[in-house]
């Protein structure tokens, strides 16, 4: 999985539209148990990854896309923000071999 837009290092204005990409894995809604599938979780400004053997907590820094969404628009405060995608299975638990994007940094002006 990866963040298609915005690009790493990009300067943007709020609201920010994010688009997610995937290959070799299917995007499915939460609750849909299917091999090689899951749904996106967006990690915002996390210094450390959450526990990888438990359901990901929903918070302002861990946004769940349980309907299988691949795009969203977010209001972000001005400043530098880190963004990373982490795929969770039907129960919101990361896969045994985590499926995640590179962390990118954007600046909201």
Each PLM stretch: what is its role?
Residues 14, 38, 77-79:
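A glycine-anchored, Pro-Gly-centered beta-turn/N-cap motif
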Residues 32-40, 100:
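Short coil-to-beta strand junction motifs in C2/discoidin
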Residues 21-32, 93:
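Short amphipathic, basic-aromatic surface patches that mediate peripheral association
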Residues 10-25:
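Contiguous beta-strand segments within globular domains
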Residues 1-13:
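Short, compositionally biased P/S/T/A/G/V-rich stretches that sit at domain boundaries
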Residues 96-109:
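Short beta-strand elements
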């Amino acid at each position: 999985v990866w963040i298609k837009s915005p690009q790493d290092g990009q300067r943007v204005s709020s609201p920010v539209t994010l688009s997610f990409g995937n290959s070799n894995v299917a995007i499915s809604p939460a609750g849909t148990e299917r091999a090689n599938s899951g749904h996106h979780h967006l990690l915002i400004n996390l210094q450390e990854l959450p526990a990888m053997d438990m359901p990901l907590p929903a918070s302002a820094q861990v946004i769940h896309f349980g309907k299988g969404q691949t795009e969203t628009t977010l209001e972000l405060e001005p400043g530098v923000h880190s963004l990373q995608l982490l795929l969770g299975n039907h129960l919101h638990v990361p896969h045994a071999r985590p499926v995640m994007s590179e962390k990118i940094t954007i600046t909201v002006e």
